[in-house]
């Protein structure tokens, strides 16, 4: 891996892409320290310290890279864009017009991307309104005035600022994808989580439980190794191509394979589950600010440290893993493409039998992959409960960090291989 990075810096255009990506990420981290207008800067620190052990606050703050804790212009993070992308992907299955756009290639994808941007703005605006009242609810808990002169004009100013911050992040992510290395949106989430690692290390080192301090590094290494193993694991289906006549030449039949990953859905189900499970406690927090017992009970019931949250998140991860795998990989289309180009699976007839065969294999692979995602997402939460650690750094974060790191290294490797440089995969 080190040789890959060093080799990349020796190539001028790749070096420019890496530096451009690093510059955008640095600007993002800078934005998480710029407070939103209309917020009392002196009260922000008191609120952040008071609510450091609040489960929902810690979860939301993690994905904003600490921006929520500082109530910065990037307090929403990139999550509205993630939710909008997931919603559009779900709608492509049930809305015929969107499904048609998906099959129109680059032109259709550009239209879907534009719809995603519009939906992102709407979701960010709605979430900004909710966050303003969430900030107001924090005032009573922290005993400070976070938003002086709570007027309609002040609320509108904060909402517009937070929405604009999300739109700016969306643009920065697209810039990284177009002109940098890796997927821009994923790297922004990656940067948000990595920025919280020092706090996590400090929480581990200062934990009074000596046993926890000793075994935690071994657990972390084991979890990372397991994630890499499953993320890279695949079932290779042999594909045989018959002899074909191209022009006046007879081409020999070739043999290759179709890789089916154990975790075809990647980290999308985990992100989706985390974003959905954050809604009930947030609503409970908003309702409970007026001393409403139902709101308080709802927030406590779905607290990220509670078993109700772990169970609900695990169920959502398993269900959405199956659904997203079905969306991203269509056995019928794959079988038709193989038949069209003269390919077949040895021992399986082309056409419908091939589609049924691929569907069975995919179902067998998806089940353990979904269970693995749910287990990894739940394990750190269980450890936090057992050790009374107050830093929220769950399995969702670990999965995202490792997944994005692997994908980025693969893209960097591909850039090097295009230029005939020796890379990481030897």
Please annotate each region the language model reported.
Residues 1-102, 107-426:
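N-terminal cationic and glycine-rich segments that engage phosphates or anionic surfaces
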């Amino acid at each position: 891996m080190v040789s890959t990075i060093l080799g990349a810096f020796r190539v001028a255009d790749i070096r420019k892409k890496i530096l451009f990506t690093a510059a955008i990420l640095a600007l993002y981290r800078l934005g998480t320290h710029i407070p939103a207008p209309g917020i009392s800067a002196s009260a922000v620190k008191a609120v952040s310290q008071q609510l450091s052990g609040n489960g929902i606050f810690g979860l939301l703050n993690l994905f904003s890279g600490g921006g929520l804790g500082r109530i910065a212009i990037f307090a929403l993070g990139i999550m509205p864009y993630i939710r909008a992308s997931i919603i559009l992907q779900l709608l492509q299955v049930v809305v015929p017009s969107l499904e048609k756009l998906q099959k129109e290639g680059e032109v259709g994808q550009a239209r879907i991307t534009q719809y995603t941007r519009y939906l992102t703005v709407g979701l960010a605006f709605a979430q900004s309104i909710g966050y303003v009242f969430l900030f107001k609810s924090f005032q009573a808990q922290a005993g400070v005035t976070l938003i002086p002169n709570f007027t309609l004009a002040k609320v509108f100013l904060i909402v517009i600022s937070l929405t604009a911050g999300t739109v700016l992040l969306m643009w920065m992510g697209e810039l990284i994808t177009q002109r940098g290395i890796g997927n821009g949106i994923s790297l922004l989430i990656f940067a948000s989580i990595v920025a919280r690692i020092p706090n996590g290390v400090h929480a581990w080192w200062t934990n009074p439980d000596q046993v926890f301090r000793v075994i935690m590094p071994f657990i972390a290494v084991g979890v990372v190794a397991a994630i890499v193993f499953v993320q890279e694991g695949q079932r290779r289906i042999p594909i045989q191509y018959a002899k074909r006549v191209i022009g006046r030449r007879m081409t020999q039949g070739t043999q290759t394979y179709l890789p089916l990953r154990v975790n075809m859905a990647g980290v999308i189900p985990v992100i989706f589950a985390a974003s959905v499970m954050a809604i009930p406690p947030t609503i409970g927090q908003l309702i409970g600010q007026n001393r409403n017992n139902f709101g308080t009970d709802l927030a406590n019931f779905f607290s990220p440290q509670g078993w109700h949250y772990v169970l609900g998140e695990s169920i959502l991860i398993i269900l959405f893993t199956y659904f997203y795998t079905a969306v991203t990989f269509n056995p019928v289309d794959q079988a038709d493409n193989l038949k069209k180009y003269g390919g077949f699976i040895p021992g399986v007839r082309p056409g419908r039998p091939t589609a049924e065969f691929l569907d069975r294999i995919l179902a067998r692979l998806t089940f353990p992959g979904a269970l693995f995602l749910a287990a990894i997402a739940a394990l750190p939460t269980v450890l936090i409960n057992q050790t009374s650690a107050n830093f929220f750094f769950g399995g969702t974060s670990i999965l995202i960090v490792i997944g994005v790191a692997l994908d980025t290294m693969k893209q960097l490797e591909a850039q090097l291989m295009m230029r005939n440089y020796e890379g990481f995969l030897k």
